């Protein structure tokens, strides 16, 4: 099973909009569009698990809320700093969703933040 977390990213939204347009023009069927989205889910999860080598660290000023439901952790953090080598990015609020997928945790940083506290 592949999680559908990344459909809500810029790439995922653009893909869905393009597929909707193709369906409306009659160039593909809704069934084919669904197959494309399912393949996207598998491919993006695989790529993030196996190809991304960059590491970053983050530190939160405050854990606002957390919950665990159906093997999915959700954390809402406030006053967060992300650091990668020499670059520092600050966020007012970050939501992290972590799903257990075959012993690998996938993270989604979403909706998040105003850069540098703006």
UniProtKB/Swiss-Prot annotation:
Origin: domain of life: Eukaryota
Name of this protein: Transcription initiation factor IIA subunit 2
Protein keywords: Nucleus, Transcription, Transcription regulation
Taxonomic path: Eukaryota, Metazoa, Ecdysozoa, Arthropoda, Chelicerata
Family in the record: Belongs to the TFIIA subunit 2 family.
Cited function: TFIIA is a component of the transcription machinery of RNA polymerase II and plays an important role in transcriptional activation. TFIIA in a complex with Tbp mediates transcriptional activity.
Cellular localization per UniProt: Nucleus
Protein's GO biological process: RNA polymerase II preinitiation complex assembly
Any one Gene Ontology molecular-function term assigned to this protein's record: TBP-class protein binding
InterPro entries according to UniProt: TFIIA_a-hlx, TFIIA_b-brl, TFIIA_gsu, TFIIA_gsu_C, TFIIA_gsu_N
Organism whose genome encodes this protein: Ixodes scapularis (Black-legged tick)
PANTHER family: TRANSCRIPTION INITIATION FACTOR IIA SUBUNIT 2
One Gene Ontology CC term in the entry: transcription factor TFIIA complex
Subunit structure: TFIIA is a heterodimer of the large unprocessed subunit 1 and a small subunit gamma.
